[in-house]
């Protein structure tokens, strides 16, 4: 019996739990991942002519704030927009850039952007 045949025979006798453990150990040992690669495909437009259609959902991203004196005003506005507590809003502002809201209409996004900019955010 060759080496390969004996390895196949031994692997075939493993339980499911043992096979999972073997997989994890080999991933560590060889520095690889057994995960399947993920492919993202953009949805195809319903009509060929609508390739340049307008975006319908928008995201408001806090990049930071200009003036350290306006930090409190920015935190207050972030709290109003996101319904976060004081501590969470402060951490979010200090760790910018961060997404505040997604899936907004263009008008909602522009309104939030204006409020944040008026408070001193970028």
Curated annotation (Swiss-Prot):
Record's keyword terms, sorted: Ribonucleoprotein, Ribosomal protein
Biological process annotations from GO: translation
Any one GO MF annotation of this record: structural constituent of ribosome
TM regions (residue ranges): none
Superkingdom per UniProt: Bacteria
UniProt xrefs under Pfam families: Ribosomal_L12, Ribosomal_L12_N
This protein's record includes keyword Ribonucleoprotein: yes
Bias kind Basic and acidic residues: ranges: 104-122
This protein's record includes keyword Transmembrane helix: no
GO cellular component: cytoplasm; ribonucleoprotein complex; ribosome
Region (Disordered): 96-122
Family: Belongs to the bacterial ribosomal protein bL12 family.
NCBIfam families in alphabetical order: L12 (TIGR00855)
Known function: Forms part of the ribosomal stalk which helps the ribosome interact with GTP-bound translation factors. Is thus essential for accurate translation.
Quaternary structure note: Homodimer. Part of the ribosomal stalk of the 50S ribosomal subunit. Forms a multimeric L10(L12)X complex, where L10 forms an elongated spine to which 2 to 4 L12 dimers bind in a sequential fashion. Binds GTP-bound translation factors.
The name this protein goes by in its record: Large ribosomal subunit protein bL12
Organism per entry: Liberibacter asiaticus (Citrus greening disease)
């Amino acid at each position: 019996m060759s080496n390969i045949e004996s390895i196949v025979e031994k692997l075939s006798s493993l339980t499911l739990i043992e096979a999972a453990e073997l997989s994890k150990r080999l991933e560590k040992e060889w520095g690889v991942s057994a995960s399947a690669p993920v492919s993202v495909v953009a949805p195809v437009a319903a009509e060929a002519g609508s390739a340049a259609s307008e975006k319908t959902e928008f995201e408001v991203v806090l990049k930071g704030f200009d003036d350290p004196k306006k930090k409190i005003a920015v935190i207050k506005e972030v709290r109003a927009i996101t319904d976060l507590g004081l501590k969470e809003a402060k951490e979010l502002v200090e760790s910018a850039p961060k997404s505040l809201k997604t899936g907004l209409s263009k008008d909602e996004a522009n309104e939030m952007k204006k409020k944040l900019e008026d408070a001193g955010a970028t």
